[in-house]
Amino acid sequence: MFDIGFSELLLFGVIALIVLGPEKLPQAARTAGQWYAKIRRTVSTLQSEIEAELDLAETRQLMQKELAKIRQTEAEMRREMAEMRGSIKEFEHSQSQNLKTSDKAASPANQANNDSAIQNNNEPATFSYAYGQSNNLTDSQQLSNQDITSINSDAVTDSSTIKQPAQPLITKPWENMWFRLGAYDKARRLPAVPYLPNYKADILLNSSFDSSFDSPLNTQASVNQQESE
């Protein structure tokens, strides 16, 4: 920190040894080291605080610049919005003026048409000898048009029926189709299995039946024994 070399330290040590003596030199060196450590700590803290302040100042400057940019863009957007509103108002005003002029131009024409219609209605109607002929002509024209449309529709239906080919059958009958049934379907569809006694497994329970079926003499002996008892 102070740019002190080894020779300077050696010179300071010799001078302190001469001035203080060998007894007070260790204590003086200890106190000097403590003071040196305190000075280093204070210097480091001051340096860190100064750097933090500088960083804060830089960040503040950057924030101020960004805020200035944001405010500038906001002012530009407001100006553009004001211009758009002014143009919209001008367009609406021009449209209203055009509508007013068109209404003013159409009103005298409508009045003239109404006046001519009123005059025509006030005039007496002249009798025309071709009234019945015109009605007959219109009726004959309607009938001819109906005949033509019916002929065309019949032709269209005939052509459509002729052009439609026979569609092949896509579905197949359910022949030779087998399905595997589950437990639920088996329980619902199949009947219950009849119970048959297992003579081989239940030997003790069915021993009398086996002996009776095996020899009729044994059955007779058993009957006689029961009677004697």
Swiss-Prot record:
GO cellular component, one term: TAT protein transport complex
GO biological process: protein transport by the Tat complex
Gene3D superfamilies from the UniProt entry: 1.20.5.3310
Stretch list, region Disordered: 90-131
Transmembrane segments: 1-21
Coarse class of the protein's main subcellular location: membrane
Any one Pfam family match given in the protein's UniProt record, by short name: TatA_B_E
A GO molecular function held by the record: protein transmembrane transporter activity
Ribonucleoprotein recorded as keyword: no
Record key words, sorted: Cell inner membrane, Cell membrane, Membrane, Protein transport, Translocation, Transmembrane, Transmembrane helix, Transport
Cellular compartment(s): Cell inner membrane
Membrane topology of this protein: Single-pass membrane protein
Biased composition (Polar residues): 108-131
Alphabetical list of InterPro entries matching this protein: TatA/B/E, TatB
Key word Cell inner membrane present: yes
UniProt similarity note: Belongs to the TatB family.
Subunit structure: The Tat system comprises two distinct complexes: a TatABC complex, containing multiple copies of TatA, TatB and TatC subunits, and a separate TatA complex, containing only TatA subunits. Substrates initially bind to the TatABC complex, which probably triggers association of the separate TatA complex to form the active translocon.
Functional note: Part of the twin-arginine translocation (Tat) system that transports large folded proteins containing a characteristic twin-arginine motif in their signal peptide across membranes. Together with TatC, TatB is part of a receptor directly interacting with Tat signal peptides. TatB may form an oligomeric binding site that transiently accommodates folded Tat precursor proteins before their translocation.
NCBIfam families recorded: tatB
Protein name: Sec-independent protein translocase protein TatB
Source organism: Psychrobacter arcticus (strain DSM 17307 / VKM B-2377 / 273-4)
Gene: tatB
